[in-house]
Amino acid sequence: RSTAKDEILTGSYIDPTKTRFPLADYSQSVDKWIPPDSADYTIPVIDSATQQRYFSALKSHYFGMDSEAHSPWNDFYITALLKKNAAQARDASIKQFLSDGSTYWGENFRLYTSRWKEEVRGNTDTQIDNIYHASRRGIMVRESLVRALPTDDPLFNDPRQAGEGYPFDNLQMSSLRPGTPVYTLTKSKDQRWQYVVSPAVTGWVHSEDIASTDQKFITQWVLL
């Protein structure tokens, strides 16, 4: 049941103007709130032409091969990206998180040591070729976390500060779903990580989460 304001002890509630909102009192079935027999139930939110336009834009962004598309499988896009210093974002993360003066905490609430920084930095010390190679195109075969550095170790700001520490991992950028196209810019020295371009983010993912593709596969995949 909801809690009346006069039942709340003075000083025991962060905001006395608010009361409890018991989720159990509200149906979690969408049909309760949008009845299937309502007059406008089958009316689309956007018309079919608009739906198709946005769907085509999405497909182009992921798999488009023309000079305007930003697909990781698109040689026009990747070639242009490589000419713009593709290593800049990678090197910025290395400088921010692994420089001698950087101060970050691990999951044990202790500061990361210089040795840890050196190990991770050494694993990133690989060259990014500024020439496009079709053989570096790939596809994600499982859900994969995208990391700012090639490590699964979390990296936190001062956990003593409000809004910092767990679970706010500075190295966790995003994730990629199975079927997402990628282009590998480089691999870590231990070969366990690949620094990839995806349609939405560039970062480090586990090598085991990627499968190589060739032109035959790409042609078939795009036609699906």
Regions found by a protein language model. Give the residues of each.
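Boundary regions of SH3-family modules and the immediately adjacent low-complexity/disordered segments
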Residues: 3-167, 174-177, 183, 192, ...
